[in-house]
From Swiss-Prot:
Pfam families assigned to the protein according to its UniProt record, in alphabetical order: Com_YlbF
Organismal lineage: Bacteria, Bacillati, Bacillota, Bacilli, Bacillales
Protein name: UPF0342 protein lwe2240
Family membership noted in the UniProt record: Belongs to the UPF0342 family.
HAMAP family xref list: UPF0342 (MF_01526)
Length: 117
């Protein structure tokens, strides 16, 4: 019986959305967005992250000004309880995603490990 891999992926999507970790992340994100100060700080933090990632991906040097802004914004978000909670929930979801990725990659790892013998 052939397996539709995309159906499995959609089932995984639904399953992830039902995990306690995702539901907690969703609640934490809602709380940040309901607080104007936290929302503004979090958006600024994400903007700085994107700027740094874009510079890294294009091989641009990250200048002192960008580093200083990143440090300033990081300090601000670390002082905001709602954002800290959100980041903790993001870390829990990241762990799950990494575990799932490891499982998904197992067939390829097994294939290449067998062919190396």
């Amino acid at each position: 019986m052939a397996v539709n891999i995309y159906d499995l992926a959609h089932d995984l999507d639904k399953g992830i959305r039902e995990t306690p970790e995702f539901l907690s992340l969703q609640d934490a994100y809602r709380e940040v967005n309901e607080n104007a100060d936290a929302k503004a700080k979090f958006e600024r933090f994400r903007d700085v992250q994107v700027t740094i990632q874009e510079k890294q991906m294009t091989g641009q040097e990250i200048d002192d000004e960008t580093v200083n802004v990143a440090q300033e914004v990081a300090q601000e978000v670390q002082e905001n309880e709602l954002i800290v909670k959100l980041m903790e929930k993001e870390q829990a979801m990241s762990t799950i995603i990494n575990d799932l990725n490891r499982i998904i990659m197992t067939p390829l790892q097994d294939l290449y490990n067998v062919s190396n013998d």
